[in-house]
Amino acid sequence: MGLDNLKVGLAQMLKGGVIMDVVTPDQAKIAEDAGAVAVMALEKIPSDIRASGGVSRMSDPGLIERVMDSVSIPVMAKVRIGHFAEAQILQSLKVDYIDESEVLSVADSSYHIDKRKFTVPFVCGATNLGEALRRISEGASMIRSKGEAGTGDIAQATKHIRAILSEISALTQAREDELPARARELGAPIDLVRETARLGRLPVVLFTAGGIATPADSSLVMQLGSDGVFVGSGIFKSEDPKAYAAAIVQATAQYDDADLLARVSRNLGQAMPGVSNLDVRFSSRGV
């Protein structure tokens, strides 16, 4: 239990911040200089994964190590859902966090990784409270609402964060004798359901991901109740990555200051091109 608390505590340290996808050490330095609390090292950002199709896997360990060597902030890396061997490799590299990610191809359609067997904290995606609690029961130390990565479209991100938070709100209104039935409906352990009802929030940090492309997008999900944001394609597919990175960090930290939001949103150049008609929905993977 001590290790679990330590891992959850490490994830709590990222609260209120921005985690940025990077594919080179230079991009990692841009993210760090802009004030990112962590970077996600991968070979392709989600929009390129979406465009190229095929099977997407864990990134080359050499790339991950080069990113780790280039920055002082925490480094995350992605593994396929259920691929515990990829996770073992990342743990051996001493990455700071592992993301069991629906953005990559699914390795096991029946089981997620048993994250309790690892010393590294895990991040997992969810579209609703049941998914979130199941991932936490497997050992996830952070949940991110999935959204639709690589689209630049915030619609699914807002849908998923609203779904999770509204289901938590409903739990807090339930009587104690109703919670076992709620647990069955959610497909989640009763102890986690009770803890969530008592806390009025998840027992781990809840970030938002998928489609965040502007400072206003970040402000929106923070005002809805997110603890922080992941930004993938939105930074390095924009016209001015340095400016967008800095602006989104400021917007996340001071999300309720409309004057600041207006100021940091000025003269940023073109945001990433958006994709709204999806042939592949990453968010449907790994429920």
From Swiss-Prot:
The gene is pdxS. D-ribose 5-phosphate binds at residues 21, 150, 211, 232-233. It is an enzyme of class 4 (lyase). Keywords: Lyase, Pyridoxal phosphate, Schiff base. Its EC number is 4.3.3.6. D-glyceraldehyde 3-phosphate binds at residue 162. In the presence of PdxT, forms a dodecamer of heterodimers. The lineage of its organism: Bacteria, Bacillati, Actinomycetota, Actinomycetes, Micrococcales. Belongs to the PdxS/SNZ family. GO terms for molecular function: pyridoxal 5'-phosphate synthase (glutamine hydrolysing) activity. This is Pyridoxal 5'-phosphate synthase subunit PdxS. Pathway: Cofactor biosynthesis; pyridoxal 5'-phosphate biosynthesis.
